[in-house]
Every structure is written in C-alpha cells, then in structure tokens.
Amino acid sequence: MTDPRETVPPGNSGEETIEEAFAWLDRTVEAINREAVNHLPRELIFQVWQRSWRYWHDEQGMSQSYTKYRYLCLMQKAVFIHFKRGCTCLGGGHGPGGWRPGPPPPPPPGLV
C-alpha cells in the first residue's frame, strides 16, 4: 500500500514547477474541505472562504493562490482545534449542513 501523504511539499525538492505547486495547493484545499465538511458547519466553511477572499484578494490585492493558502491555514487550524477539543463525530460527521438544521449553504466557489 502506498503512503497517501505527500512526502515532499512543493518548494522543497527543487524539481517542481509553479504549475505543480498550484496543483498541489488546489488538491490540498479540496482535501481539507472534504474533511472539514464532516466536522464543521458548512456555513462556517463558506464564511471563512468568503471572508478570506474578500480580505486577502479584494482588499489586500493578493493573488488567488495566496488567498487559497491563507484559507488553507485557517481551515487547518479550525479542524485541528476541533479534534484537539475532542471530536465526537465518530467518523460520521454532523450530517449535511453541519450543526445547523436545514439545507446547507453553497460550498466555496470552485471547491465542490
């Protein structure tokens, strides 16, 4: 069985291209979203995405990749704290929409 973790992130091996680094970032953001949606309210994920985009991209003028990177850092921290506080999801998550009843809000754009 192969190890699903990436052993060398982009920027450390000296062999990758910028396109490979962006592809790695996209894959990692999608992976954290797939995991976060099982543990955090979808509305929270959507708001973090929207506010990250609004602040880092629109107000600060940062690139899309930088905005995704900052979003990734925030989501990693949120998921870490969720697990650190004692996740009781038991692998099943909180169901669609997180802890809030009703239909889930739309996912972050481009991160379905």
From Swiss-Prot:
Keywords of the record: AIDS, Host nucleus, Host-virus interaction, Inhibition of host innate immune response by virus, Viral immunoevasion, Virion
Record-level GO cellular component terms: host cell nucleus; virion component
One Pfam family cited in the UniProt record for this chain: VPR
Keyword Iron: no
GO biological process: symbiont-mediated suppression of host innate immune response; viral life cycle
InterPro entries according to UniProt: Lentiviral_Vpx_assoc_factor (IPR053711), RetroV_VpR/X (IPR000012)
Subunit record text: Interacts with the P6 region of unprocessed GAG. Interacts with host VPRBP/DCAF1, leading to change substrate specificity of the CUL4A-DDB1 E3 ligase complex. Interacts with host NUP153.
Protein name (Swiss-Prot/TrEMBL): Protein Vpx
Gene expressing this chain: vpx
